[in-house]
Regions:
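Short flexible coil/turn linkers enriched for glycine and charged/polar residues
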Residues: 3, 11-13, 107, 137-139, ...
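Canonical P-loop GTPase G-domain recognition
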Residues: 120-175
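Catalytic P-loop NTPase motifs of RecA-like helicase/translocase cores
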Residues: 91, 121, 187
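N-terminal accessory targeting/assembly segments
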Residues: 1-94
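Conserved beta-strand/loop subsegment of P-loop NTPase cores
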Residues: 78-85, 107-118, 140-145
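A conserved segment at the C-terminal end of the G1
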Residues: 178-189
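Residue-level signal for inorganic ion chemistry
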Residues: 44, 104, 116
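Histidine-anchored nucleotide/phosphate-binding helix
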Residues: 95-110
Length: 189
């Protein structure tokens, strides 16, 4: 019987949990005791588990205490969020941006702001949006507002900001989350 290990859940599907430890991924199933104790493991959870032998999956034994947890998406122990907001289609909204930031701060999640669709708005409107975003920079939020869409220099700064951190990408529907992710990680499914 193998020794128990501790790692982070990186994927959950149909009762299976993939747990990463030092670059190795182990497939596990939750023990019945988790269900009996009404514990639902989430992606991002740190967990104790018993690795499987050969091709057999192991067993997730215990979910360790969480720093934070979100319902949508269901994820735990989030270090930071990249909050995507668009200049247009949908229109920029300080009110909505504030609501997202309050939600993230309430869950002790560091936020960074990324402005998309800067090429689709009028220059005067973009100037006003950038003035609004400067206020967020003044209170400590990193803001990425590229002049041209998906500027490689800005993308490199965003990538550097989430190295070695569990980062979620969030924002209103249509703001460009998937498009940004596909530019950050080409070939992402």
């Amino acid at each position: 019987m193998s020794e128990n290990l501790t790692g982070r859940i990186i994927k959950q599907i149909s009762g299976y949990y993939d747990i990463a430890v030092n670059g190795t991924t182990y497939r596990t199933r939750g023990r019945g005791s988790l269900r009996n104790d009404k514990i639902t493991p989430l992606v991002g959870d740190f967990a104790a588990f018993q690795p499987g032998e050969g091709d057999d999956e192991g067993y997730l034994l215990k979910v360790l205490p969480r720093h934070n947890a979100l319902v949508r998406p269901p994820v735990a122990n989030v270090d930071q969020a990249v909050l995507i907001t668009s200049a247009v289609e949908p229109d920029f909204s300080k009110n909505l941006l504030d609501r997202f930031l309050v939600y993230l701060e309430g869950h002790d999640i560091h936020a960074e702001i990324y402005l998309t669709k800067t090429d689709l708005t009028k220059p005067q409107r973009l100037t006003k949006i950038r003035q609004d975003l400067a206020g967020y920079t003044k209170i400590g939020y990193p803001v990425f507002a590229p002049d041209k869409p998906f500027d490689p220099t800005i993308l490199a700064q965003v990538q550097a900001s989430f190295a070695d951190k569990l980062t979620i990408f969030t924002g209103q529907t249509g703001a460009g989350k998937s498009t940004l992710l596909n530019h950050l990680v080409p070939g992402l499914d």
